Regions:
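Hydrophobic, small-residue-rich alpha-helical packing segments that form membrane-like cores
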Residues: 313-317
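Carboxylate/His-rich catalytic cores and anion/metal-binding grooves
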Residues: 223-246
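Short beta-strand edge segments in extracellular beta-sheet folds
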Residues: 98-104
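Aromatic (Trp/Tyr) and acidic
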Residues: 17-91, 101, 111-197, 201, ...
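Proline/serine/threonine-rich low-complexity linkers at boundaries of modular beta-sandwich domains
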Residues: 8-11
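Solenoid-like repeat scaffolds
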Residues: 375-383
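Short coil/linker segments at helix-helix boundaries
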Residues: 205-230, 267-274, 292-309
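Helix-capping and short linker residues that terminate individual alpha-solenoid repeat units
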Residues: 211, 240, 298-299, 320, ...
Length: 586
């Protein structure tokens, strides 16, 4: 199968692969040429058909991750601005693109607006993203089975495998909670504390340190705070009430009893909803996010900040009482109705919670705990490898480096962050498509685009800490891959690029399944290539292909083409950093 077919494109992508959105003026620009030519080839940069730069390509040989023979094109900084740029080489011409200082402002806003469109428990009006995306409130009182306004605990015996194993060991609870609100996690109706935790933390980080590094686009800080508060208030509702078993812990998730078909809009969901057993991981996510929220909202809303900090401290105490209550892998059930988000190594979650509480309070006990963690500087855990919902140590270390505190070893923490960024730049330099994601086994993981973007947040943090432009330059080049400089020549962000994906796995952005419904909104990031191709659609279409080609833009390909809040969150950070990365060219 050709790369174009794998991407679901009706025409072949041009052999010159470039960021389809464009480049920033004054920042080194790059592209990749697909060719089996052995020697260097001439290239030309065109603006409205007029040549404005030229040079020779650099042969890079066979890129195993892409399954292609390639050259790289290093254009250097461009001091012009315009919308009609293209690169020509070896008889091929790239898709047109722009060079503008404000290139990423629209993407930053769109990536953030995605969260508003994922809101549960509230009507989405046409003013948010247009009439096509307007919908009634989902999972509210009056919805089938009562929605999320009065949710019971999962009854005992509802999580028994075919082998007779009860994943929750007989657990249930007599309490019911109003867990209205929050974000739908992905393309289904589940809401998960561990995925919400890292996502809201990164939106808070966009306020706390991204906004201190570059000026945010107009109105974005207000929108960031509004979205963060929406999720934080939901996290607080997920706590087990006083007097119940596991009081103070956070329920791991609230979800449907069974998977719903595509399409199913939130307000039409017919499934009963249940609270799943609390987990230590979910609780520590709540602790960390609430403590960070207490810092961010301290000036704007001291009362809300105090509520968040009180909840963080109380739930931390509850986690100490139940340090190893793990969420099971519910995927082993025949029809689980929700993702498991299971995790057996909580060292990073404990570190993250202690870090955020220390940064919020200066508490010496939390300082002792974070310094004793395997995830702290000098410890055995490489916290910056594959930052994700299941590996949050790197996020904690970045916040410890970026947020002012009295930490005695602050210089060592900051040095560890910049050293990680240097390693990322070194990896990036070896990749002909300019991205820093290069697993040792050559296989791309689930959500590879999210993992890549989290590596870029490390570069952004290093740029914030040092002001060195090489980190900014690496940040910009890494984004090229997401927006079209890849083996398939596809932009993985809907509405941004000439060949952007538009059939991501979703139950309500489901135009492919029902033409009356919309495609995913502008700014929605696809999870991207996944070597495992775990769903039947991608397995049949692209299974076994080179890593970068293990992707298809199909609504049924949930293993490679889903949308989730935790992948869009680093997109918000990176796009916001790039939106303020340069001043307009003169």
């Amino acid at each position: 199968m050709t790369a174009a077919a794998a991407a679901g494109s009706s025409t072949s992508a041009p052999r010159v692969r470039a960021n389809q959105l464009g480049w920033l003026p004054g920042v080194p620009a790059h592209a990749t040429l697909v060719t089996d030519a052995v020697g260097p080839l001439p290239w030309s940069l065109m603006l409205d058909g007029r040549e404005v730069a030229r040079g020779l390509t650099t042969p890079r040989g066979h890129d195993a991750s892409a399954g292609l023979d390639v050259h790289t094109i290093d254009v250097g900084p461009i001091d012009l601005e315009g919308d009609g740029f293209a690169i020509a080489a070896d008889g091929a011409v790239s898709d047109p693109f722009a060079v503008r200082a404000d290139l990423y402002a629209g993407l930053a806003r769109d990536a953030l607006r995605f969260f508003h469109l994922q809101r549960s428990g509230v009507e989405i009006g046409p003013e948010v993203a247009g009439e096509a995306y307007a919908r009634p409130a989902g999972h509210v009182a009056g919805s089938p089975h009562g929605g999320d306004a009065d949710v019971p605990c999962l009854p005992a015996g509802h999580a028994v495998t075919g082998d007779g194993v009860d994943l929750y060991e007989g657990w249930t609870g007599s309490h019911r909670l109003d867990v209205t609100g929050g974000w739908y996690d992905a393309g289904d109706h589940g809401k998960y504390v561990v995925n919400g935790g890292i996502s809201v933390a990164q939106l808070l980080g966009a306020c706390e340190w991204v906004g201190g590094t570059v000026p945010l686009p107009d109105g974005m800080e207000r929108a960031l705070r509004d979205e963060a508060r929406w999720e934080l208030e939901w996290l607080l509702r997920m706590r087990v009430p006083s007097g119940a078993q596991y009081a103070g812990l956070a329920h791991h998730k609230v979800s449907d009893e069974r998977w719903t078909p595509i399409p199913t809009l939130p307000h039409e969901d017919p499934q009963p909803r249940y609270l799943h057993r609390p987990s230590t991981a979910a609780t520590l996510n709540l602790v960390a996010a609430a403590a960070q929220g207490a810092r961010v909202f301290a000036t704007e809303d001291p009362e809300f900040a105090a509520t968040l900090l009180e909840a963080a401290q109380a739930s931390y105490a509850a986690a100490l009482r139940h340090p190893d209550l793990l969420a099971p892998n519910t995927n082993v059930l025949a029809n689980a109705g929700s993702g498991p988000y299971d995790d057996t190594d909580l060292r990073d979650e404990w570190y993250w919670a202690a870090v955020e509480l220390y940064l919020a309070t200066g508490d010496e006990r939390r300082l002792e705990e974070l310094r004793a963690s395997d995830c702290h500087v000098g410890g055995p855990v490489d916290v910056f490898a594959d930052i994700d919902w299941q590996r949050v140590g790197g996020l904690a270390r970045l916040h410890l480096a970026l947020v002012p505190s009295r930490l005695p070893e602050a210089d060592a923490v900051r040095a560890s962050a910049t050293a990680a960024a240097d390693a990322i730049l070194a990896t990036q330099a070896g990749q002909p498509f300019g991205h820093p994601y290069a697993p040792h086994d050559g296989r791309y993981d689930w959500g590879s685009n999210g993992l890549l973007l989290n590596q870029l947040t490390v570069l952004g943090a290093a740029w914030s800490l040092t002001g060195e432009s090489r980190y900014r330059d690496g940040l910009a080049e890494g984004m090229d891959y997401v927006l079209g400089r890849n083996a398939l020549g596809v932009s993985y962000v809907t509405g941004h690029g000439a060949r952007s994906v538009h059939n991501q796995h979703s139950r309500w952005y489901a135009h492919q399944a029902d033409p009356r419904l919309p495609h995913p909104p502008r700014g929605a990031l696809s999870g991207g290539p996944n070597s495992a191709t775990p769903d039947p659609v991608s397995a049949a279409a692209v299974g076994g292909l080179p890593a970068q080609q293990c992707f298809i833009d199909d609504i049924g390909a949930w293993g490679v083409n889903e949308i989730t809040v935790n992948w869009n969150a680093p997109l918000v950070q990176v796009a916001a950093l790039l939106a303020g990365a340069v001043r307009p060219a003169r």
